[in-house]
């Protein structure tokens, strides 16, 4: 039976909510009569007891009676670079809303966290990777599905929306450098302990191994067929991982191809193991949050520059990932850090993997859609319609802006021409007149080009004004003071 620090909840309700001396007496002997005291033998320092890290399988520390910590990180524009990503034992990523993937960093030892952030809102998809480990979920605010899941299980999280600065801190220098406020909140191991203490909860407790770790055969260079992986979550969000033969690790890159580094340590983010878990996807009842079938599917596993197809199962939200090799035997995972992508394969998502010579690998077919999912054809048609509507809006805005600027440009030309008439041989005035004329020509061309778009594109229907009863999507909250 799986043991959680939190209380269990009803399985049926959970399924619905998912759609802590005595001194010796003196003698009469004189110093001369007293026998010399025996020299005290030095006491050997106790040897630190090492235990296996439940998230990496490495025997490199003391993890007994320590709960892992699962911190949700912000990933939207302006959140990078993030603190603590290279120090994490595991990174889990998957799209929960919109087109940008959500990210969770897992740490086996809370005391190893020097700083992690910017801390983002909790998401139920990510929680399903954390709860089986008896991990402490750490986030700032959370959506309704994450809240329902935690409430059903009576599982205590650490939410900055409630606990505030007891467990979270603000980096003023980061904001002074131009970062938005929500991208400046972070936490540390000490702050996490403080926050848990305020709830009467604890970072001590049982932990569960993430995978079945063990020794794997070394991959010969000629068998390295999976060295460059690109996981596309959307047109605006893709993850690249490239195998480094020197280190034996998969190094994570930013979308622009630059190395992904830790804002705290400056270290390259890299992993021994890379997983892409296929999961059928659809849309939840709010119309925009992603729904995944997390009971199982197929996937790919990368290690040592090679890849293989795997299968995975998961009993429920608190059930661990069970991985099997293609032949049906339990998968042995190499000890080390892991990157886990949960990938729906729906419209706009893709997956490419190449060998060192650039040869593209034939990967398993993408997962099927859930009933609430949108087919590729329907999604493409909707995207085309949206793109056309946006093109019309952009063209109209360009015409309006250019027209507004034209009067000022014509006035500037008149002033430049008047100055030149008074001093016709002045080279600077000639240049100023020519620049003013060029600006007018540019604006007129902009108007003409966008008028052509407006005349050929269908005019989008006007969106009715929202009624008073309409609910707006809640804004993400900053930690409570």
Descriptions of predicted regions:
Residues 95, 129-130, 141, 154, ...:
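Sec/Tat-exported extracytoplasmic proteins
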Residues 1-9:
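Bacterial N-terminal signal peptides that target proteins for export
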Residues 374-481:
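Extended amphipathic alpha-helical heptad-repeat regions
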Residues 27, 40, 44-46, 443, ...:
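Low-complexity intrinsically disordered segments
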Residues 18-21:
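C-terminal motif of bacterial Sec signal peptides marking the signal peptidase cleavage site
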Residues 29-90, 97-380:
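A surface/extracellular/periplasmic glyco- and lipid-processing/surface-interacting theme
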